[in-house]
Amino acid sequence: MPASARWQALQEVSILNTGAELPWGGKFSGVAKLIDDAFDAIEKDNEKLKGVLQRISGYAVNEDTLRGLIILFSDTHFTRPTYNGEPVHLGAKDILGHVYEYFLSRFAQAEGKRSGQYFTPKSIVSLIVEMLEPYSGRVYDPAMGSGGFFVQTERFITAHQGNINNVSIYGQEFNPTTWKLAAMNMAIRGIDYDFGKYNADSFTQPQHIDKKMDFIMANPHFNDKEWWNESLADDPRWAYGTPPKGNANFAWLQHMIYHLSPNGKIALLLANGSMSSQTNNEGEIRKAIINADLVECMVALPGQLFTNTKIPACIWFLNRNKKRKGEVLFIDARQIGYMKDRVLRDFTADDIAKIADTLHAWQTSDGYEDQAAFCKSATLEEIKNNDFVLTPGRYVGTAEQEDDGVPFAEKMQNLTALLKEQFAKSAELEAEIKKNLGGLGYE
């Protein structure tokens, strides 16, 4: 890192008077220029960050505000952090990573629906990574947003005493600002990556067209209606059928299958409609993918997990070389999780472990059992008999109701009596309302 771009240099020089001599030559002309020059030096020293760092001077931020931010960050203990007076055993790189992730999540909450292009809730990212277990190989996200799946992959590997150098990170992103967010996310954590030469559309300008990937994870925009280009009409990626021009769900799925290595695995977040839609060739594409025995597991998610959409979602897990041929595991997780506030649901660590452990037990046949209303192992024949619909609720059934010992006839008698009481109360209230309206002259 060049001397002029180190934090200590910014801290010491930012308090100088305009015109003062700089330690590395030249004169001090303001904090914004100082920071921009530091960005220039960083990009010159790191080719991958060229054009990524936004210049401060373009935002006309007050000089005193910039000085205050530098002082605030300088007073923060990144090297010896504490929480509630107790030391936190994390390195400076990890702390900075958490800070960056925190701001992304807060921006996502503030942005609401617009945040979907760059942010996937951490609990969903954690669930997918725990289920896929990307210990080594090529990891790819064709709709990477700010790179959350890559960050969680690093955490997963570290937690299991692995080596991050055993994975290669590949990603692509259409939005230029989001592409830069992802690059900065990797740089802060020291993760090497290949995001292509520039931001680009994964369908019309694939940056990794010849690469085969071992783990592919993605959360693309649900039901994207504006993805089609006539150049895609005879694309070799549509091996299971041409996706409808008005919905990109099965375009994403087939794009990912195309890039799958012989032992590769996929986790793809899609709208629930992808599991049952029969319109515009989607049913035929799903049928072909099922018959190819690529689908390994389907997970139905609870609502209110996302800041940007209320569309019910699911996760498709595909495996090019799954152990249990001719079978699919269905998991209905719609009742799992807790409300973290009035509008958003989240998973606990135990929730994530329950879902992930169910898949792993099923894969190894080690202690797995079907559980009514939660999980079910179904054969391809059963799926065929259900018209190739992959909705977990159709297979897992409902939980058995505990017998309370009250005879059915007695229950019906009590319910009927309660209903009569409610009808009578309703009639009484209706009469009272009419009386009040009449008193106001509204017969």
Curated annotation (Swiss-Prot):
Gene3D superfamilies: 1.20.1260.30, Vaccinia Virus protein VP39. Signal peptide: none annotated. Its EC number is 2.1.1.72. InterPro entries: DNA_methylase_A-5 (IPR003356), SAM-dependent_MTases_sf (IPR029063), T1MK-like_N_sf (IPR038333), Type-I_RE_MTase_Subunit (IPR052916). It comes from the Bacteria. The keyword Electron transport does not apply. S-adenosyl-L-methionine binds at Q117, Y118, F119, T120, P121, K122, S146, G147, G148, E173. Type I restriction and modification enzymes are complex, multifunctional systems which require ATP, S-adenosyl methionine and Mg(2+) as cofactors and, in addition to their endonucleolytic and methylase activities, are potent DNA-dependent ATPases. Belongs to the N(4)/N(6)-methyltransferase family. The type I restriction/modification system is composed of three polypeptides R, M and S; the restriction enzyme has stoichiometry R(2)M(2)S(1) while the methyltransferase is M(2)S(1). The subtype gamma methyltransferase (M) subunit of a type I restriction enzyme. The M and S subunits together form a methyltransferase (MTase) that methylates adenosines in the sequence 5'-RAACN(5)TAG-3'. Methylation protects against cleavage by HindI. In the presence of the R subunit the complex can also act as an endonuclease, binding to the same target sequence but cutting the DNA some distance from this site. Whether the DNA is cut or modified depends on the methylation state of the target sequence. When the target site is unmodified, the DNA is cut. This is Type I restriction enzyme HindI methylase subunit. It comes from Haemophilus influenzae (strain ATCC 51907 / DSM 11121 / KW20 / Rd). The lineage of its organism: Bacteria, Pseudomonadati, Pseudomonadota, Gammaproteobacteria, Pasteurellales. The gene is hsdM.
